[in-house]
Structures are given as structure tokens and as C-alpha cells.
Design a protein with these regions (language model features):
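Positively charged n-region of N-terminal signal peptides that target proteins for export
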Residues: 1-5
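Bacterial N-terminal signal peptides
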Residues: 6-15
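Short, low-complexity N-terminal intrinsically disordered segments enriched in polar/charged residues
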Residues: 16-46, 50, 165-166
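A short acidic/glycine-rich loop-to-helix N-cap element
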Residues: 20-24, 123-126, 154-163
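A solvent-exposed, acidic/Ser-Thr-rich amphipathic alpha-helical stretch
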Residues: 28, 45-110
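A mature extracytoplasmic/lumenal domain signature
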Residues: 52, 62, 114-116, 133, ...
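Exposed beta-sheet edge and beta->alpha loop/turn motif
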Residues: 107-142
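Low-complexity, intrinsically disordered terminal/linker segments enriched in charged
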Residues: 142-166
Length: 166
């Protein structure tokens, strides 16, 4: 009986052990990304400017990085080509944002999933695009790299309708 009790207590402690990955949605990093998204929707990039360092690598559907200045200029231009820009997830306004602390070499990542929606000013078409963005945080508390994944085909069509040569 004593061995059974010891085995039960040992199993209880092992069962309660942390998996090593900690996931949160209301932490400081998730809130910083949410503030940047709220700013994007209002065409105000001051919160975004606070996220990036001078050497942040940003990848948009590519293995070739762009600078944070190029990234912010591209996202700001959305307001030139679209109206009624919104982000939602599962019918809820805003993006779903979570931060995962992996530890070791993997570090801390914040992920965002959302449906981007906007009406093209040139075409009048409304587009909905599923998006996933992953932000890796550096030791300095700034975003070290960003990976943005979405289908850009509708955006390219809208740019063509607006007469932009690519």
C-alpha cells in the first residue's frame, strides 16, 4: 500500500510538470503586437516603429528580407489602395495573437492569425485574405525577425487595377 501511495504521489508531480513551452495571450508582447495592428488599421505606425530595431529582418512570403522602413511603407500604402480595411478571426474583430516562450535557441515568438479584409479603391472589389505572422523577439525586447504569410494574388490584381507597374 505504501508503494502504491508513493507511486500515486510521483505520478501526480510528473503529471503537473510544465511541458517547457509557455503560451500566453495577454502578455506584454502580445499586447504590443495588438497595439501595432490597431495602429495599422488607423494608418498610424507609431506603435509599429517601437517594435523594430534597425537590423530587424522582415520576410514577406519570401526568404529575402526587407527593412522595417520598407515594411512600414508597404503596409502604409494599403491605405492608398483600399478602404474599409479590417482584421478578424473567426468572425471576431481583431487578430488572434499569442506569445510562446520556447526557451533555449528558439526563444520567444508571437504569432498572429487573422483574415485581412479591404475594398479596392480602383476595382471596387472586396478581398478577404487569410494571414499568419510570426515575430521572433530579440534579447533587447525588440522584434528580431518577422515572417508574414499570405496569398498576395488579390493585392497584385488591385495594384494592377490602380495602374501600378510591378
Amino acid at each position: 500500500m505504501r508503494n502504491f501511495i508513493l507511486l500515486f504521489v510521483a505520478a501526480l508531480f510528473v503529471g503537473c510538470a510544465s511541458s517547457g513551452v509557455q503560451v500566453t495571450t495577454d502578455d506584454e508582447k502580445s499586447q504590443a503586437i495588438k497595439a501595432a495592428y490597431d495602429g495599422y488599421l488607423a494608418n498610424d505606425f507609431s506603435a509599429s516603429n517601437e517594435l523594430y530595431s534597425d537590423d530587424t529582418a522582415i520576410y514577406i512570403n519570401s526568404v529575402e528580407s526587407i527593412s522595417s522602413e520598407e515594411n512600414l511603407a508597404a503596409f502604409s500604402s494599403h491605405h492608398d489602395f483600399y478602404s474599409d480595411i479590417s482584421m478578424s478571426n473567426g468572425g471576431v474583430d481583431g487578430a488572434y495573437i499569442q506569445t510562446s516562450v520556447y526557451g533555449g535557441e528558439l526563444g520567444t515568438w508571437t504569432h498572429a492569425w487573422f483574415i485581412w479584409k479591404g475594398t479596392g479603391n480602383a476595382s471596387g472589389n472586396t478581398f478577404e485574405v487569410p494571414c499568419h505572422v510570426a515575430y521572433q523577439w530579440g534579447d533587447d525586447g525588440k522584434v528580431a525577425q518577422t515572417w508574414f504569410f499570405s496569398d498576395q494574388s488579390n493585392h497584385l490584381k488591385e495594384l494592377a487595377a490602380a495602374g501600378v507597374e510591378l
